[in-house]
Amino acid sequence: MRDYKKAVLGMTLALSMVVTGSSLDGITASAAAKSSKKATVKLSSGKLILKAGAKKTLKLKKKNVKKIKSMKWTSSKKSVAAVSKKGKITAKKAGKAVIRCKVKYIAKASKKAKTKTLKCRVVVKKNTKATPVVTKAPQKTPVVTPTTVPTAAPTTVPTAAPTLSPTSTPVPTLAPTETPDDPAVTPAQTYATSYKGMTANNPLLANSFASDPTAIEYNGRVYVYMSNDTQEHYGQGDDGENGFGYITSMHVISSADMVNWTDHGTFSLAGGKADGLESYSNCCWAPCATYKKVNGKDKFFIYYTNGGYQINVASADSPTGPFYDERKSSLLGPWTDNESTGDALDPAVFTDDDGSSYLVWGGDCGRPEGSKKYPRIRKLADNMISFDGEEKAIEAPYFFEDSGINKVGDKYVYSYCTDWDTRTGQYKDLDICSIAYMVADSPMGPYKYVGEVLPNCGTVFKKADGSDDLANNHHSIVQFKGEYYMFYHTTVLRTSMGIHFAGRSTHVNKLNVKADGTFDIVQQNLDGVPQLADFDPYQTVSGLTSSNNAGMGAIETNVIYHKNGKVNYVNSIDGAKMHTIKDRAKYKYSWLSIKGADLGDNGPKTFQAKLKGYGLGSVNLKVCADALDGTEIVNTTVNFDKYGDAKIEVPAAAVQGKHDLYIEFDGSVLDFESWQFAK
């Protein structure tokens, strides 16, 4: 999940800030105590964020303890947060403090008293709300070498992406006004330039950073769940480092043909720092997903890493939410009822043919001292938010992080990212930070090492100067429409943008399974996967569906600043809407494209679209075939009413056959909701 070797140190530093209330030695003691039935004492919370004037009582949690002899509470800074003799904290003014509780206790299996000092870090904020500042990712001119995408024979017509039902009917409000273009400004070029080039299928997204992919198949579509690196980009800026600390949401996309992707947007799961679902979680990294029938209906479960030391779970009744917190607490890791002997990082979830589900996890950061550097696997209970049975180690050689688990044929495949250590013996040819795999006859193992399947992506997609762009990776294997595919991430998009920030982008290439069940090495490239089916332009198409785009955004983010201008946190707004990003000095038209649309033998008669814009404004909309300046199918002016709404049906040129479509906008669009042709 992390990108650079130095991130090992960075993650350790991040862990020291997030895993509060105990040191790593404390985690070791707690995990060991659980397994050996020894006494444990800990605080009800390791970190609190309070507003000035608020009060909160810390409680002592104990296990296998016969008697508490004494408790002494102290604060490192009473002017910020005071604490009473009974553990009640009073937040006084903005700042930070550490609350300590010195506990003297006697274990059930002992007559001697032991003493332990527990900690809770407290952050006190002013009792006022900061003003949100909405920002957009800067538009840069990318340097991308176009690649050729192989043509695939069409097979079936893809199904449309599911549409979430609105929860209420909004009361119309007047649309915001826009800043008019300066007529004296002449655009440097006619069309915005795509960060991913004109013909490439990789990366999957051209207008945002999204990483740590996990893919599942559901009802004829593949859904990909990713970490929202764009959130970190907003917090750090083009010249900042990707430290993952601002990421509190996941990004979800889906496709029926592996080329045209519908952007379902971002979903804030962690709420400890921003306005997310689960207030006890600070970060949302490396989400994974599965579904199973519960009470006769399909139910979806998202597992993710909370700051590198805990794993949380959210539930939903559809693959794209809305998501809800069914468990109400962290699932796995320190300060939970499921402490692990390993590092609770980078979960992967697998549901077997019999309906049994398993969670596998692990990493090399925050691992309890003395424990083996191996991933762990544990069977989930039927409710999917608790466990059924004990965890077991998978003895994966040179394991680092990023687990995956699949069933291929009659074998169970465990895959993972290798570490940076020097190899010896039978593993001397195993690349650093590559994806390796093992096989077993049972989900719980034992697993046998097979080999490497995905070399380090930085040896394929290099830096602008031609040197290797070595980084850790994160992957996902999925079977879709009879074939296997490997999802992974690279920093190709940031290289194209010419920025320092190591934003990661998800790719996909085919994974070939040989007759004996082993894998060929995945051939990584920008071509990606050939289109699996013709696209139907006569269905209602979400404006969030595209194979490529430029000068357009889909997700939205609020950057919350302190008074001195320093970023406090970055809140990702749930969902998405396709909108133009106006930069008149650089380009005239923003655009999106659809690959492989079948217009039929007679071609369309009309083009329909629904948009939102600025009140009483207008935008020029064009639809062209096969190129940005290709054959015009539609060229019309869209006029918005005072509410910013527009719904059009205009004549279309009867272009026949299969074509790539380019939908182009000269002007400002707040939300390109949907479109379709009619015969």
Question: Could you tell me what each predicted segment is?
Answer:
Residues 8, 27, 41, 50, ...:
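Extended hydrophobic/Leu-rich segments
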Residues 2-26:
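Sec-dependent N-terminal signal peptides of Gram-positive bacterial secreted proteins and lipoproteins
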Residues 128-186:
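Ser/Thr/Gly/Pro-rich low-complexity, disordered linker/stalk segments of secreted
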Residues 18, 25, 32, 46-47, ...:
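Serine/proline-rich low-complexity intrinsically disordered segments, especially terminal tails, linkers
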Residues 95, 176, 180-632, 637-679:
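Carbohydrate-active catalytic/glycan-binding domains of CAZyme proteins
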Residues 10, 16, 70, 118-120, ...:
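Residue-level detector of intrinsically disordered terminal segments
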Residues 24-141, 146:
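Extracytoplasmic soluble-region selector
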